[in-house]
Structures are given as structure tokens and as C-alpha cells.
From Swiss-Prot:
Residues given in the record as NADPH binding sites: T12, G13, S14, I15, K39, Q40, N126, E128, G212
Residues involved in 1-deoxy-D-xylulose 5-phosphate binding: K127, S153, E154, S183, H206, S219, N224, K225, E228
Role: Catalyzes the NADPH-dependent rearrangement and reduction of 1-deoxy-D-xylulose-5-phosphate (DXP) to 2-C-methyl-D-erythritol 4-phosphate (MEP).
Family: Belongs to the DXR family.
Listed GO biological process terms: isopentenyl diphosphate biosynthetic process, methylerythritol 4-phosphate pathway involved in terpenoid biosynthetic process
Pfam family, one: DXP_redisom_C
Organism: Neisseria gonorrhoeae (strain ATCC 700825 / FA 1090)
EC nos: 1.1.1.267
Protein's gene: dxr
HAMAP family per record: DXP_reductoisom
Identification of the protein by name: 1-deoxy-D-xylulose 5-phosphate reductoisomerase
Amino acid sequence: MTPQVLTILGSTGSIGESTLDVVSRHPEKFRVFALAGHKQVEKLAAQCQTFRPEYAVVADAEHAARLEALLKRDGTATQVLHGAQALVDVASADEVSGVMCAIVGAAGLPSALAAAQKGKTIYLANKETLVVSGALFMETARANGAAVLPVDSEHNAIFQVLPRDYTDRLNEHGIDSIILTASGGPFLTTDLSTFDSITPEQAVKHPNWRMGRKISVDSATMANKGLELIEAHWLFNCPPDKLEVVIHPQSVIHSMVRYRDGSVLAQLGNPDMRTPIAYCLGLPERIDSGVGKLDFGALSALTFQKPDFGRFPCLKFAYETINAGGAAPCVLNAANETAVAAFLDGQIKFTDIAKTVAHCLAQDFSNGMGDIEGLLAQDARTRAQARAFIGTLR
């Protein structure tokens, strides 16, 4: 059996670490070609020592020199690269069959697009790729025969319960709607009057999932679910009026598909990202993920409620941007990323995140976003607008 050759972008983040955990359980199935870890050189060096990739990519020359020194000390022959072009190169290398796209934010877009242009199997954990460039990315993947497999737990759940021959047309398969579940984050029942005083330390403590700081804040505002709505729209060719969100605090049901005959099919499991990662990596097999069995006897209850747009305005913004189309999702993402970074840095209040996004969506922006250069230019303009607005809030 020829092993699948993988590039793992974002290997030092939570998705990357979970991916490597799954890969380590199946050495006969996978070989790691390249790892990319931005600035976490110590963690990346340890990964290189274990998995012996040909290449490791970091952010800049300074971090590359540090990583090279660590690898030389440990006798690891991995070649060190740095910069954005290096990410593109290891994602599109001829030797690579599959690319785990797990770089957080719009920074992951160029490398994901490069993988699509080369017809790779893309394990998509970077939701911003579809939020910022949905039409362009999916058209590029289709034109070059690239398979796009969703790693996000919600989209992976949908992928598992859709008909195996799903052809991007809900009506042809008797599908009424797609239902994304959301935990509601750590502030689901918190008094709204206290939201101004929420700290970054409180916001990053997700009740169920182990995630990075940025996505944890997005979960707290439900901006994450908003981005997932846009992602589902592009992944499954689903119109916004066929996309539902339901809050499910236990995070046991990861998403559902409602069929015309009244059936609702759901995917359940413990909240552990190794399950969707193993599902994607193993297709068409089901392989061991290391995740424990779901113990139904230990579940006290599964509860559901509708989201409150007053509590979670960022979710409302996402529905509006899907309907608006054009550059609106790109603006939403750039404004949110900038605002979350400012919040985590202690510059603004938790409630200022939504205010910043609303401000940027109210600005004039281009409707035509047909190429990567135009998308990145709009992304940069919105980030500048967001930073300027944040400056007025201090």
C-alpha cells in the first residue's frame, strides 16, 4: 500500500496537533512531507524530530534560523523554509497528495488556493478560505479535480450524513435544509449587562472543545458559527434560507440534515477534532482516531434552543453577508479577525468586536471579487478601516 503524502499547514495549532496524532496511529498509511508552524519553533522542532518531514516552514528568517539551530542540535535533516511563498510551495509540491489546511485566518488562503490549482486532496480546516473566496476557491477546485473534504466538525458531520452521491443540489436528493449545531459558547446564559466586562481569559475558555484563542473568541461571539454558515453555503451549494442554526450546549450532535420526508439525520460523537480528521484522512475507510466511544448512559440530556441575534449579533451579520454576496463575506472576516486580535490584546471590549464588524460592513466595498489579488486588496482595506475604528474606541 502506497502511503498518502501529506503537507500539514498549521501543524503547531490544535488542528495540526490532532492531525499528527491521527497520522501517528497509522504510519503505514501516511507520510509527512512538510510541516508549517508559523512562529512556534520549539513545538515544530519536536514535530520534525518525530515525523521527519522533508520541509518545515516558519514565518520569517529569524524563526527559520532558530528552527535550523534546534534541528541541527537534534540531528534532524529537515530543510527549513520561511515566508508566504514557502507555504504555497509545500502545498503544491508534486510529491504531495493531500494538504491539511489549518492555518488560522485569511493568511491560509493563498496556500489553500495553490493546492486547489494543483488538484490536491484538500482537508479544509481553514474556514476563512471559503468565507473570503468561496466562489473562486470552489471553481478552482472543480476545474482542477481537487477534492475538498471538510474538517470542521459541523461540516464534516453534514458531509457524513449527506447521500454519498450528493451532487451539490439539495432538491435532487430530497433535502429540505442543513442544520448547523452550536454550543453557544461560554456566555450562553451570562447576563447581557455584564458583556462589557468579559475578559479575554474568560472568552477563550470554551466549555466543550479544545481550540486556539482566536476561534474560542469566535465561538463566544458566535462569529464562528456565522463563518461556518458561509462555509456551508459554498461547500454544499446551499442557499441561506436552507441553512439553520440551533444551539446545542452539549456538543454531542455535530450537525444534521433535514429531509423532505420528515427524517432528520445527525452525526453524533464526543467533541474531539480527531474524529472528523480521521474520517477525512481515511476515506473511504473508517480508521482509528484515538477518540473514546460515546457513552449514552452518561449523557444526562441533549438540549436545543434557537439562537438570539440580540446576544449574538455576529451570527446575524453572517446571514446578511451571504445574501449580500460579493465582497461582503471577505469584509466580515477581515473586520472580525482584526477586532478579535484587538480584544485579545486588551485594546477593546468584548462588545466592541460586533461594533467593529458592523462599522466595516457599513462602508463602501467592491462587489466583484473574481481573483485572489482583488480579494486580498479588499481584505487589507477592511483591516485598515477596522484598525482606524478601533482607534476611536480606546
